[in-house]
Design a protein with these regions (language model features):
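Non-catalytic accessory regions of SAM-dependent methyltransferases
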Residues: 1-51
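Conserved AdoMet
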Residues: 2, 39, 43-107
């Protein structure tokens, strides 16, 4: 079912909207770097695509490759079903503009 839903997502804008909806409906806890579904979705989608977080507007309508779509779907699904914090999924956390490596041993 999730595969059919994500087959119709083509742009970063599409994936961002999908991620926000999935995070909101799942009731996951925010607090490992963000405090809401939108900010966490921007972080997850942009970082997973290796794009700077502050360039979202430039890439909103950029099309996603099939491999990128699989990767995003996997990360979002793990976030909502396994409740894995985005910081662990991405192996990164931010503090005052500096990126740090994190995993389950850190936070």
């Amino acid at each position: 079912m999730a595969q059919q839903l994500t087959d119709s997502l083509f742009t970063i804008r599409d994936w961002l909207r999908y991620s926000v909806s999935r995070l909101e409906e799942s009731g996951v806890f925010f607090g490992h770097g963000t405090d809401n579904a939108y900010d966490e979705s921007v972080w997850l989608v942009m970082s997973a695509l290796h794009l700077p977080l502050d360039t979202l507007d430039n890439f909103l309508d950029a099309r996603i490759t099939k491999e990128e779509a699989k990767h995003l779907a996997h990360l979002i699904e793990r976030r909502v079903t396994e409740r894995v914090p985005t910081a662990y999924l991405l192996r990164e956390a931010w503090l005052k503009g500096f990126k740090f490596y994190v995993d389950e041993r850190v936070i």
